[in-house]
Amino acid sequence: MAYQSEYALENEMMNQLEQLGYERVTIRDNKQLLDNFRTILNERHADKLEGNPLTDKEFQRLLTMIDGKSIFESARILRDKLPLRRDDESEIYLSFLDTKSWCKNKFQVTNQVSVEDTYKARYDVTILINGLPLVQVELKRRGIDINEAFNQVKRYRKQNYTGLFRYIQMFIISNGVETRYFSNNDSELLKSHMFYWSDKQNNRINTLQSFAESFMRPCQLAKMISRYMIINETDRILMAMRPYQVYAVEALIQQATETGNNGYVWHTTGSGKTLTSFKASQILSQQDDIKKVIFLVDRKDLDSQTEEEFNKFAKGAVDKTFNTSQLVRQLNDKSLPLIVTTIQKMAKAIQGNAPLLEQYKTNKVVFIIDECHRSQFGDMHRLVKQHFKNAQYFGFTGTPRFPENSSQDGRTTADIFGRCLHTYLIRDAIHDGNVLGFSVDYINTFKNKALKAEDNSMVEAIDTEEVWLADKRVELVTRHIINNHDKYTRNRQYSSIFTVQSIHALIKYYETFKRLNKKLEQPLTIAGIFTFKPNEDDRDGEVPYHSREKLEIMISDYNKKFETNFSTDTTNEYFNHISKNVKKGVKDSKIDILIVVNMFLTGFDSKVLNTLYVDKNLMYHDLIQAYSRTNRVEKESKPFGKIVNYRDLKKETDDALRVFSQTNDTDTILMRSYEEYKKEFMDAYRELKMIVPTPHMVDDIQDEEELKRFVEAYRLLAKIILRLKAFDEFEFTIDEIGMDEQENEDYKSKYLAVYDQVKRATAEKNKVSILNDIDFEIEMMRNDTINVNYIMNILRQIDLEDKAEQRRNQEQIRRILDHADDPTLRLKRDLIREFIDNVVPSLNKDDDIDQEYVNFESIKKEAEFKGFAGERSIDEQALKTISNDYQYSGVVNPHHLKKMIGDLPLKEKRKARKAIESFVAETTEKYGV
């Protein structure tokens, strides 16, 4: 194929959109944009305006109401009706988007709109709906990394998207052969929220031409914005649904409204089933002939996480009470078309209040059941069916039941629900980057290979549980976890779950960890949780304790660590606190290893959980559900979910993946072999050496194209190193891979120096560079043990009496600072150097190093503020006020900033504003840790 420029790609797209039904208009600046919006507003509201178009004053009043809002607020205004007072004091309501009759909106397309705010910018392709720029398309020529278009959008959004451009709902980026879409937001745009579009069979639609044909037809695009974008009230963000979610909702709605049949949706764990099922419920609840939509979840899933998720999509959606009489009242309340409740509560309501629910013997009702593979629904289904005679049932599951893994009564998911309406399998989700693949290790803990994981029953003359829980084996497994945990979790950047076969096993492992933990320099934070039975079987006197006593000890340990006050009388609160802890950490601390039997292995989502240790038998849906706790997408430093099996579950893993990915080829789901990654590394290393034979030669590169080649080559190498480190056989030596750790650190330092240089140049001046939009993937480079806290710990250990030892400590810190990859530490690098060179030598043994460093930073910060204010001729106290506000809110107060800058010429004002914003952000990061 001949070379195609960005201009040619843009022109081709404009022609295609015109053929699809968009009116091609010429809009070159903000004034023309406003004039076009006003014209269409008058046309669409001609009846209401009664022949009197909006006057200048009226239009200005409208702009005052809709301009200057956040992206989130703009999205709400877009979907609402806005009252406008006319000059004659009458009032009319204006709408900006027809969210029900999608094709009745007016569709236009323009290109090369120029705007000038902080910097001048020219946008590629802008799609206008009813005159508002709702979709922005940014293009790169073929061969350019699509991430550069993403970074350009981020830059434009920060510097240029103001006025009506705050109404952009969605961005589309493409290099002609790869195309993605993502929602606009006030918060940081994340690469993980860039989605591919696909067809109903989950085949990607990559090329820009095919994408436009499928996704950007006028009615389809308006439908996508109106129906399949969600305003998340809790997080105040816009969410775009993924293609498989859209197709599943449409298939379910069609089945519910055009037939009387049931059905189920099979979407893999971690693919966003909650949003899909809730959106389907919401749309069905708006159908006139459906009297009630009842969303059913299992009681154990209606925890704080589920409530939080549901209420994001519609405030107050979750019925939190377990009072069945209230559920009956809600069922009879015609103003509540949608109810979210538990399976157990619904069963009780039917059993005790059948006469009060008489109307539902004839009224059409739709039940939507989350995690419908569970046996509880099969048991309850018969009871509900007897009462709700005109009901349809739709299930959502990530792991359906087939003949191989049927429920206890032998039924499959298809037996209960009928046909599968849509599938999105684990292989699809991994391919699209919506979940991660798995790296699975099998650790042999027996010399006697005859005892296999499938021997989970009592075999004649052999008590297998006794063997599994032998003191020697339990300690062996515990030591293996302790010795490898930092490697698996990237120096405890991530959390883990350890699942074991029984409560007895959990207690034994907890006590072993507790004993061995005392010998560690940096003890692991261990927690345990299980449900005890009030009247417990003592297993013929073998166990000399009640499990509640042991749980009380675990909770007491937890209370001491996290300053809480739980007990076995408040296990629900303990559960919720652990749930929050494993997701986000508590008070700058978090659980490293959570030991469970079955809890947290289904329905629990945590992006910062990356490792599962397994010492129990798992198969089919239980295995996939447990493994899937680790594979939520987070950032570049988490390339896969790590599974460490202490039983031979190889066959069970292969069988489960075969069933739930519908393929015998598991290579797309499991990590490749060490040898394959090693070969890939060797190739990448050779490529890097061809560009820059030694690290110091990076300093000699003058050409930006060559510098870009270095960045891309080292970035690839770093990604492969990240994967190699997951393997036990990996050694960072010249003998093993041809490169040692020191050489890698030297290349990394040069890479980070280029990153700092580009970041600094971008902040200081509007310099166009091919490096501006390159994706450095800095998170992948970080070594989370070498950070500010790490350095402060070394500082505290300096022997202030022994000058020779002091010099050795100082030299150690200097070496670490030279190779610092933590962003905050790099900012503090010069400060710490000055402190150890000029302050530490003058201290004596009675001085508090922590306090001395705080005092030193305070003096330096004061000097920086005084110097910057003096250089810019601005008020120092006002600058500090802005900085304090920023430290609290993360936003530079525009009112204070405007007041401080004063009446400078426009160009100088922009320059001053940019300089102050950069100074405040950098000093906050520099002195705020």
Swiss-Prot record:
It catalyses: Endonucleolytic cleavage of DNA to give random double-stranded fragments with terminal 5'-phosphates, ATP is simultaneously hydrolyzed. The keyword ATP-binding applies. GO terms for molecular function: ATP binding; DNA binding; type I site-specific deoxyribonuclease activity. One of its GO terms (biological process) is DNA restriction-modification system. InterPro entries: Helicase_ATP-bd, HsdR_RecA-like_helicase_dom_2, P-loop_NTPase, Restrct_endonuc_type1_HsdR_N, Restrct_endonuc_typeI_HsdR, SWI2_SNF2, Type-I_R_enzyme_R_subunit, TypeI_RM_Rsu_C. Residues 254-418 form the Helicase ATP-binding domain. Type I restriction and modification enzymes are complex, multifunctional systems which require ATP, S-adenosyl methionine and magnesium as cofactors and, in addition to their endonucleolytic and methylase activities, are potent DNA-dependent ATPases. The restriction (R) subunit of a type I restriction enzyme that recognizes an undetermined sequence and cleaves a random distance away. Subunit R is required for both nuclease and ATPase activities, but not for modification. After locating a non-methylated recognition site, the enzyme complex serves as a molecular motor that translocates DNA in an ATP-dependent manner until a collision occurs that triggers cleavage. PANTHER family: TYPE I RESTRICTION ENZYME ENDONUCLEASE SUBUNIT, TYPE I SITE-SPECIFIC DEOXYRIBONUCLEASE PROTEIN SUBUNIT M AND R. This is Type I restriction enzyme SauCOLORF180P endonuclease subunit.
